Amino acid sequence: VPNAKLWDTEHPNLYTCKAIFGEDEVTETFGIRELIWNPQVGMTINGERVILRGACFHHDNGVLGACTYPETEERKMRILKENGYNAVRSAHYPCSKALLDACDRVGMLMMDEYVDVWYIHKTKYDYAGQLADWWKQDLKDMVDKDYNHPSVIMYSTGNEVAETAQKKGIALTGDMTNYLHSLDSTRPVTCGINIFFNFLSSIGLGVYSDDKAEKSAGNAEKNAAQAAGKNEKKVVKSGEKTVNKATENGKKGLGSTKPEKKKKPVGSEFYNTLACLVGDYFMKCG
């Protein structure tokens, strides 16, 4: 493209390419930019140093549900851009093409992430059982989707994957990284690592368990039922007295007025805090 107008976060210039083969026709939008990562300077786009001011977000669109629409994706990106952000991370799965198109138009940088789990289950029916057979095809599909989007600046192979502390996981880390580089040599590859999760993994413990997940789900249902009971108790007609809802056997029911105990930090909040305190001394390689 002679005298091309380059793409960057402040000037998201785009071009359209139309390919015709017989009766088939496809149109692709792309941008032209030079992306360089330098350990002394950092990341540069078209020779200009860029400091990432990013956010992580999931794919849902509020009351519209877990669907992706061009208008809603662009609205989200514009709101983030107006509030000072210039980068986003797809947590924790590859983002939609509609979102990438929005990032291209708005000038928002994207780190596209692969998965939230490798071969150690975090929940009973997650992707851990299928990853070994599908990760190569999955990564190829992600690169094919992302390749022509100037907004995509790097890939992530996972989020808080404790497997990176085990020999098998270390090998898989290298395999995934090398495979991504073979598909796309223009973008770097990273991985979300949690020091304390890795420590647990290195001694054969799992951060998540099916029992823990089921208990958490049960507690959520119990809390919802208690909240419903309290709300029911508050609705009182004029002239009626307030009573607790009782069960058939006369025991005190859902309308209990006992104050709730203050919840203690659990899950990743606790582990992250502890990891910060103990440092990387407990980081092991299995």
How would you name each of these model-derived features?
Residues 87-219, 264-286:
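Substrate-binding/catalytic cleft of secreted carbohydrate-active enzymes
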